Amino acid sequence: MSFNKIILVGNLGRDPELRYTPQGDAVCSFSMATNERKKDKSGEFQDVTTWFKVTLWRRQAENASKYLSKGSPVYIEG
């Protein structure tokens, strides 16, 4: 068995979208960007942005929808 874990630190790219399943469970989706500074072949630093799609469920989904908005800093672990 293998186990993978990811930690993301970045900012929301758009406002969270809250919806509910037919069973009544809250689901919140948003995009977030992480930024990294890397040297290119010429030795100059370049900012590299990577985008992630994030989905939260139930109470976390409701809290994210209530307290986060585009540009909010976020820490995601999962």
Residue ranges and their predicted role:
Residues 1-78:
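Single-stranded nucleic acid-binding surfaces, predominantly the OB-fold ssDNA-binding core
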